[in-house]
A protein has these predicted regions:
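A conserved, well-ordered hydrophobic junction motif at loop->secondary-structure transitions
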Residues: 1-3
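Hydrophobic beta-strand-centered segment that forms part of the acyl-chain substrate-binding groove
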Residues: 9-54, 71-75
Length: 120
């Protein structure tokens, strides 16, 4: 899960052009285990922005190092808030989904976030 947060942080801080704090990581769908010696790929994509926060979809894939295709391992969502030098929230640029795939991903990510908040 640390790699999930690391990839999410890298994506969020690049979009925010500065430091961020992790607000939420959840909605994890564990598909299969990572085996010892597997090559692991972690990919984070922006799915939504609010005034100071960013929602991301994070996907983990793994497979053998000898050319076997990578397979899905985990899908989850994460929310980060951009902060200034005093750790106060600061505004981020707006992002809007443009492709049908981006729109569908944004809707799925938001549904996971809403469900997790409702369960609290």
């Amino acid at each position: 899960m640390r790699w999930v947060d690391d990839a999410g942080y890298a994506c969020a801080s690049a979009w925010a052009k500065g430091p961020c704090i992790t607000e939420f990581v959840g909605g994890a769908d564990f598909v299969r285990p990572i085996r010892p010696g597997d090559l692991v790929e972690v990919h984070a994509r922006l799915t939504r922005t609010d005034e100071a926060s960013m929602s991301l979809a994070v996907e983990v894939r793994s497979g053998g190092i000898h050319g076997a295709p990578l397979q899905d391992v985990v899908h989850c969502v994460a929310v980060y808030t951009a902060v200034d030098m005093d750790d106060a929230p600061r505004a981020v640029d707006k992002w809007s989904p443009e492709t049908p795939g981006d729109i569908a991903l944004a809707q799925r990510a938001q549904a996971h976030i809403d469900a997790a908040r409702a369960a609290q």
